[in-house]
Structure formats: structure tokens, C-alpha cells
Regions:
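Short beta-strand-to-turn element immediately C-terminal to the catalytic PLP-Schiff-base lysine
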Residues: 8-10, 226, 250-256
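Residue-level detector of conserved, well-ordered beta-strand and adjacent loop positions
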Residues: 9, 43, 153, 225, ...
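N-terminal basic, amphipathic alpha-helical segments
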Residues: 1-62, 257-258, 263-275
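Conserved beta-strand scaffold positions in the cores of enzyme catalytic domains, especially
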Residues: 39-41, 149-151, 233-235
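Short aromatic-enriched loop/helix-cap "lid" or pocket-rim segments at secondary-structure transitions
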Residues: 52-56, 217-218, 246-248
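Short secondary-structure boundary/capping segments
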Residues: 31-33, 97, 225-226, 241
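PLP-dependent aminotransferase class I/II
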Residues: 233-276
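Conserved core of the PLP fold type I
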Residues: 64-66, 71-202, 206, 212-214, ...
Length: 276
């Protein structure tokens, strides 16, 4: 009579305990960079440790763990935690005069990750214009994702519109509210020129609004996205400066048409989802 069910066989040890390893294993030594003590550190990505509210941060984390302990183990929302995206939308509306939906916001672990998503969304056949001088890491990340970048010169109003029009770029990445490294603020006239350029075909502006929270006096400069009537601006920002680089929270706001395209193309993705 044939028996049904599950049967377990004993697994014998395939390797003798006394067996010597005869294969030569190469030893790899990792050369760690030496720690240098600088006289003056001009690194622009540092925070003041004595200014960070560690006690408050720790108290909030403990309370959230107690209040929402089960939710920390659940599958996160697509495009980032919903509460975070809602808070970002509120912040943009109140602080930057930019009215967007939380559903337009994508949260990622750093701007580099979001740059890669933009490349996949707009295509590797895109040509991205960047500012010269500018933050060279931006073009390095784009190029590492297989996209050609061109570095366009600056004039007294920002990136040269004449050079942009002569180029074959279909995307321009700019920091109009606080250019790196000069600190220039792009005037309204140049912003409207760039928007007119973007309106001519399948072109987009990536507005990198880093450092927008910091100013000595007055109100913050309005974003280009807030005056964009044709959904041509992809707005980006990060909390690396306002909180800490280790937080690794960046976000971008996609125009509705691109958000629809993104949702269809990347429905399998779950971006930054750690609730803490």
C-alpha cells in the first residue's frame, strides 16, 4: 500500500570535520583612508553637532515606537511614507508658496537616487544641461546612469539661455534660488525665459532647491515650480542640510503627466519607507 505524506531523510555531513582546506584563498586587504585633521574644514555638507537636538529627537523616536509599534513592521506606502509626503506638501505650501498634492511627491534615500529615477523616467537618450560652475557631482551621477550631460556657462543672471538654446539639451538642471558655489539668485526675467524654453517641445526643468530654508533676512525666493503654468518643472529638495546628511531623505515633486507615467512604469517600486 502506497503511503502519502511528508518524509524526512537524515542528511549526512558532506564535508569531513578533519578535511583540510587545500584551495589557496587570496587575502584581500582593504586600505582605509587615513583620517586627516584639517586646520579649516570647508566641507559644505557638515552639521554642527552641538546644535542638533539629540534629546528631543530621541524622545520623539521613543514615543513613536510606543504609539505605532505594529506599523513599523508593515509594508510601507509607495513613493514614501504617506504622513511624510503630506507633511512635505504642507511645508511647501506654507514655506515655498508651492501648492502640490502629496500624491505628486516621491521620497527617496538621497538626491542621487532620485536623479537615477529621473533618468529612467525621461530616458537615457536625454541630454541634460548643467550649470558651469556648478555642483559637479550632479553631472557625475547622471553620466553614471548613461546620460550625456553638457556644462553650460553662467552669466550675471544665471545659466546662459543663449547657450541653452544652441545646445541639443532637452533637460536643464539648475539651482535658481541659491546657485552653488556662487550663491547667485536667478532673477524673474531669466526664470521666465527658461520656462519659455521648456514649453517648446518635450523639455523639462529640474529645479534643485537645496539650501532654500537658509537665509539671513527677508522672505524666501518663490520657486520656479510655483510660476510654472505648463507642468514643466520637476522640483527637488533634501533634508540633508536642515536635519543631517545621515537622515538620507530627499524628495521630488513630479508634474501630473510625469507622475502618471511614473506610476505606470514603476508600480513595482517602494521608495524610502523607513518610518523612523
Amino acid at each position: 500500500m502506497r503511503k502519502n505524506g511528508y518524509f524526512a531523510n537524515e542528511i549526512t555531513n558532506q564535508i569531513s570535520e578533519n578535511q583540510e582546506v587545500t584551495e589557496n584563498v587570496s587575502e584581500y586587504k582593504i586600505n582605509k583612508p587615513e583620517k586627516v585633521k584639517w586646520i579649516v574644514d570647508f566641507n559644505s555638507n557638515h552639521v554642527r553637532y552641538d546644535s542638533f537636538p539629540f534629546a528631543t529627537w530621541s524622545k520623539i523616536m521613543r514615543q513613536k515606537l510606543l504609539d505605532e509599534e505594529n506599523s513599523f513592521l508593515m509594508t510601507p506606502s509607495r513613493n514614501g511614507i504617506w504622513e511624510l509626503r503630506s507633511a512635505i506638501a504642507k511645508h511647501l505650501r506654507e514655506f515655498r508658496g508651492l501648492t502640490v498634492l502629496a500624491d505628486q511627491i516621491i521620497v527617496g534615500a538621497g538626491t542621487e537616487y532620485l536623479y537615477g529615477l529621473i533618468v529612467q523616467l525621461l530616458g537615457r537618450d536625454s541630454v541634460i544641461a548643467t550649470e558651469n560652475p556648478g555642483y559637479r557631482k550632479i553631472s557625475m551621477v547622471y553620466e553614471s546612469n548613461g546620460v550625456r550631460t553638457i556644462h553650460l556657462p553662467m552669466d550675471n543672471q544665471g545659466i546662459s539661455i543663449d547657450e541653452l538654446e544652441k545646445s541639443d539639451a532637452n533637460i536643464v538642471h539648475i539651482s535658481p534660488n541659491h546657485h552653488f558655489p556662487t550663491g547667485k539668485v536667478m532673477p524673474a526675467a531669466r526664470r521666465h525665459q527658461l520656462l519659455e524654453w521648456a514649453n517648446m517641445g518635450e523639455r523639462y526643468i529640474i529645479e534643485d532647491d537645496y539650501d532654500s530654508e537658509f537665509r539671513f533676512s527677508g522672505k524666501p525666493i518663490p520657486t520656479m515650480a510655483s510660476i510654472d503654468k505648463n507642468q514643466k518643472v520637476i522640483y527637488m529638495n533634501t533634508f540633508s542640510k536642515t536635519l543631517a546628511p545621515s537622515i538620507r531623505i530627499a524628495y521630488m515633486v513630479l508634474p501630473f503627466e510625469l507622475m502618471d507615467k511614473y506610476t505606470k512604469k514603476f508600480r513595482f517600486l517602494f521608495e524610502y519607507g523607513f518610518k523612523l
